[in-house]
C-alpha cells in the first residue's frame, strides 16, 4: 500500500487525473471504476481539462460507478447520474453512452437491479483502475461498517453518520435518501489497481484507522490491505502525522 501526502486537494487531484488520462491514452479499451462526491470534484475538473486539451479518443473506454442513491431519478440534481454528467460526461461528450455504467437508483425492483448491475461487473471483467473516496466512518462505496467482506452489489441502509455527512448536498437532512445501491467490497477488490483519495480534517481519523487498524468489518476500508496494488493520496489536513509530504515533481 502506497500512501502519499501531496499537500493539497488540487495537487493530489491533478496527479490522479494524470494517472487516469495515461490509462485511457495507453489502453484505449480500459475499464475505469469511478466515484462521486465532494472529494472527486477537482479530479474530474482536471481530467476534463486534459481530455479537452488533447482530444483523446475515449470511444472504447468503459466506466463503472460505485453507487447511487435509492429513490432518486437520473435527472435529480443530487443523483450520481446527474453528478457524472455534470462533472465529466457532458464536459467531455465523447464517451460512448453504451459503455457508461451507473446503477439505477429508481428501478421498480432494487434487489433485481443490484443483481443486474453485479452481472454487468462480472461480465465486463476487472477494472483497470478503481477510484475510491472514504467516509468518515471508514466506508468505501456505500459499504457501511458491518458489511461482509464477500459482499457483491447490494442495497444498503445508510447509517445516521453517512446521512448527516451527505446532508450538506440537500436542502435539509430529511431529504437525504435512506438507502443506496452499491458495489460490494468483493467487487471493489476485483480491480487491478485501486486509488483512494481523502481530503480535509474530517477524513483524518478514517485514514488513521485504515492505516493502523487490523482488518475489520467495523472499518470497511481496512479490507484494502488485502489488495496488492492500492495507492492513497491525501492533502495536509487528512494526513496522519507519520506520513511525510511529497511534491508531485518528486514522484516517478
Curated annotation (Swiss-Prot):
Gene3D superfamilies: 3.40.50.1360. This is Glucosamine-6-phosphate deaminase. Catalyzes the reversible isomerization-deamination of glucosamine 6-phosphate (GlcN6P) to form fructose 6-phosphate (Fru6P) and ammonium ion. It comes from Staphylococcus aureus (strain NCTC 8325 / PS 47). Transmembrane segments: none annotated. Signal peptide: none annotated. It comes from the Bacteria. GO terms for biological process: carbohydrate metabolic process; glucosamine catabolic process; N-acetylglucosamine catabolic process; N-acetylneuraminate catabolic process. The active site is at 67 (proton acceptor), 137 (for ring-opening step), 139 (proton acceptor), 144 (for ring-opening step). The gene is nagB. Keywords: Carbohydrate metabolism, Hydrolase. Belongs to the glucosamine/galactosamine-6-phosphate isomerase family. NagB subfamily. NCBIfam families: nagB. Its EC number is 3.5.99.6.
Amino acid at each position: 500500500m502506497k500512501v502519499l501526502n501531496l499537500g493539497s486537494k488540487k495537487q493530489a487531484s491533478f496527479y490522479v487525473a494524470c494517472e487516469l488520462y495515461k490509462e485511457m491514452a495507453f489502453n484505449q479499451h480500459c475499464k475505469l471504476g469511478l466515484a462521486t462526491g465532494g472529494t472527486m470534484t477537482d479530479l474530474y475538473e482536471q481530467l476534463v481539462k486534459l481530455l479537452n486539451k488533447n482530444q483523446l479518443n475515449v470511444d472504447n473506454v468503459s466506466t463503472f460507478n460505485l453507487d447511487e442513491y435509492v429513490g432518486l431519478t437520473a435527472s435529480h440534481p443530487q443523483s450520481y447520474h446527474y453528478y457524472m454528467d455534470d462533472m465529466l460526461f457532458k464536459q467531455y461528450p465523447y464517451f460512448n453512452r453504451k459503455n457508461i455504467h451507473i446503477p439505477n437508483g429508481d428501478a421498480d425492483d432494487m434487489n433485481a437491479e443490484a443483481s443486474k448491475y453485479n452481472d454487468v461487473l462480472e461480465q465486463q471483467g476487472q477494472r483497470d483502475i478503481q477510484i475510491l473516496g472514504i467516509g468518515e466512518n471508514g466506508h468505501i462505496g456505500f459499504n457501511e461498517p458491518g458489511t461482509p467482506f464477500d459482499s457483491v452489489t447490494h442495497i444498503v441502509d445508510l447509517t445516521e453518520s453517512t446521512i448527516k455527512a451527505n446532508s450538506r448536498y440537500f436542502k435539509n437532512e430529511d431529504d437525504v435518501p435512506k438507502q443506496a445501491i452499491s458495489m460490494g467490497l468483493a467487487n471493489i477488490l476485483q480491480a487491478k489497481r485501486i486509488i483512494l483519495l481523502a481530503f480535509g480534517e474530517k477524513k483524518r481519523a478514517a485514514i488513521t484507522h485504515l492505516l493502523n487498524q487490523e482488518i475489520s468489518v467495523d472499518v470497511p476500508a481496512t479490507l484494502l490491505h488485502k489488495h496488492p496494488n492500492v495507492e492513497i493520496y491525501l492533502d495536509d489536513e487528512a494526513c496522519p502525522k507519520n506520513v511525510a509530504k511529497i511534491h508531485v515533481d518528486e514522484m516517478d
